[in-house]
């Protein structure tokens, strides 16, 4: 995999073809090419979502990267849960099933009572996979974001080993932001940036050092990206991609983790600069509560949110979790194609 490439850019560049990896994934099913017009109707009549099988339940905050031999999915869980697929459709739990066997000791010292690790994000640059993760407790902004790296995701390789580099950024009880839900993007000039945030004063961004993956000493500004003033200030889970002349900031509004009562939904804004300002389709700044809705609930799939984006075979897919009303509200993996209109705005059918 080439240097200086994040998951989004690597997939978008077309380097994720089988030739780019020196492997051939045979027998791949034909993936859907077009979307019907998006609808707000709470009916499950569309055929756009990928028909997934395997280990799909108990998935929160999913993110996918295509590596040397397969697709890998990372999600919230005890030690960061890992799943693997060779075709993007059938998912199997890896063995061992987690990145960590326990919450790192350094994180427990800083966040007493933390029981699990949340909202991972993975990218490849500087010859390593960089997985950012968060540790916190519900309802608190005493939180930390850490970094663990690996030179390969192939567990059969002799080089496979996760190396934890510890603290990247933290937030405190007397602060106005929350250091969880990290997402990395490398801008068009080759500089890495980490966005993060949940509730409080919203989504923030800081510049990273390319060599270390840690905060930059050259630019220490904490840039504000998005904020809400209603629904308890519920905006979180940033994910940024670059497309055409714009950077697109996806976030989740409202409430997760309530089963079929969850009201999570993905919103988006865009900017010509990675640090903003981001505005929605109506021109409302995301720092003023703006956002154009992307995902909608259906009779079956409630609270579709906390997304990542995967570009594969010429299609952008939104990867997220939703709560399955036909399975007692269990959080479940969903992958759906995005369609971009003539004005450069994304949408997805329910």
What do the PLM-derived regions correspond to, one by one?
Residues 2-29, 35-350:
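Carbohydrate-active catalytic/glycan-binding domains of CAZyme proteins
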């Amino acid at each position: 995999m080439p240097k200086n490439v994040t998951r989004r850019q690597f997939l978008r560049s077309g380097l994720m073809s089988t030739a780019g990896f020196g492997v051939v994934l045979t027998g791949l099913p034909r993936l859907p090419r077009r979307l019907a017009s998006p609808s707000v109707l709470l009916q499950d009549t569309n055929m756009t979502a990928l028909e997934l099988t395997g280990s799909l339940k108990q998935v929160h905050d999913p993110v996918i990267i295509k590596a040397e031999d397969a697709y890998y999915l990372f999600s919230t869980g005890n030690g960061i849960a890992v799943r693997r697929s060779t075709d993007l459709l059938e998912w199997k739990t890896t063995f061992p099933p987690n990145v960590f066997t326990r919450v790192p000791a350094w994180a427990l010292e800083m966040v007493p009572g933390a029981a699990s690790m949340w909202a991972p994000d993975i990218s490849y640059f500087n010859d390593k996979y960089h997985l950012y993760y968060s540790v916190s407790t519900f309802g608190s902004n005493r939180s930390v974001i850490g970094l663990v790296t690996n030179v390969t995701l192939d567990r059969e390789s002799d080089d496979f080993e996760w190396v934890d580099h510890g603290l990247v950024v933290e937030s405190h009880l007397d602060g106005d932001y929350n250091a969880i839900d990290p997402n990395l993007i490398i801008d068009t000039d080759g500089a890495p940036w980490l966005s993060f945030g949940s509730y409080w004063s919203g989504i923030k961004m800081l510049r990273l050092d390319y060599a270390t993956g840690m905060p930059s000493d050259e630019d220490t500004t904490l840039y504000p990206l998005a904020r809400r003033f209603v629904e308890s200030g519920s905006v979180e889970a940033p994910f940024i991609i670059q497309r055409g002349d714009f950077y697109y900031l996806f976030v989740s509004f409202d409430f997760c983790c309530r089963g079929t009562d969850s009201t999570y939904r993905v919103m988006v804004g865009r900017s010509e600069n990675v640090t903003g300002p981001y505005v929605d389709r109506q021109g409302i700044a995301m720092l003023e509560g703006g956002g154009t809705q992307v995902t909608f609930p259906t009779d079956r799939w409630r609270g579709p949110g906390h997304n990542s984006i995967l570009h594969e075979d010429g299609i952008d897919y939104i990867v997220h979790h939703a709560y399955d009303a036909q399975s007692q509200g269990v959080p479940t993996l969903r992958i759906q194609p995005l369609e971009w209109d003539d004005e450069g705005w994304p949408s997805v059918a329910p």
